[in-house]
Amino acid sequence: RNRPSKKLFDLVYKKLKKKKLKRLLNNSSRFFSLNVGKEIHQLIKKKEKLILFKSKKDVNKHFGWDNNKPIVLILAHVFTEGNLSHSWNLFHNNFDWLEETIKKIKKIKSVNWIIKPHPSEHIYKSKVMTLDIYNKLVNDELNIKLFPSSHDIQDFDKFISAVITSSGTAGHEYPMKSIPTIICGESNYSGFGFTLEPKSKKEYFYMLKKINKIKKLDKETIKRCFAYNYLNKYVALEKIPLLYDTNITMQFE
């Protein structure tokens, strides 16, 4: 679904000249903010006034965290969506992925972990929510917190060292900001060289254990991500004027 061919990707990647890349990097904050959370979901809550974290110090103060530890963002999924649409995944479904991930990070104290529920959980009305899994598994682990619903995810990329997603859109968004992103299953953007893709659970859990050692992405890797986003935004997707523009709630007026 909307996955560009490797041949087309390689063509765009090679054509992306250094001057163009420099301009993209200089405008990466704007390009990033235009894309993160703009798929369909956050648009629903657009009218709500949300709080922005001002700094990493502000984040750590909010959660009572140590300023010296890196922050890793884990982006949860809707557990009833996208479980059978990939050719490979390290886990049976997104529910298992989150549960097993939390069980592992409970033992990793060198990192502050923040889990963000999917913004459209309440629309799908799943019987199990991210909060349920969090409450079941997280006890007195002070370095594992839920992202507060009162706050906006925009600009949070400035305060984190890495991102983890099963196979969500974050995998082609955060690498634009040189943030290493681990994915656990096939996606439209997997295999193009800008995400970390463990081949087994053992390798994935090892990455989690060593995640505080992961370095920022280099310019060539970021370039690969921009090449994909160019294809995704301007080539692969085409608006059809006859279709009504709406959001996932499907509430027509």
Language-model features: where?
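Nucleotide-activated donor-binding/catalytic signature segment of Leloir-type glycosyltransferases, i.e.
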Residues: 131-148
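Flexible loop/turn segments at secondary-structure boundaries
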Residues: 79-84, 120-125, 153-156, 171-173, ...
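A donor-sugar binding/catalytic signature common to diverse glycosyltransferases
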Residues: 149-196
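C-terminal amphipathic helix plus adjacent low-complexity
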Residues: 8-69, 202-253
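Short acidic-hydrophobic, aromatic-tinged amphipathic segments that line or gate anion-handling sites
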Residues: 144-148, 195-207
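Beta-sheet entry/capping signal
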Residues: 71-73, 111-114, 145, 161-164, ...
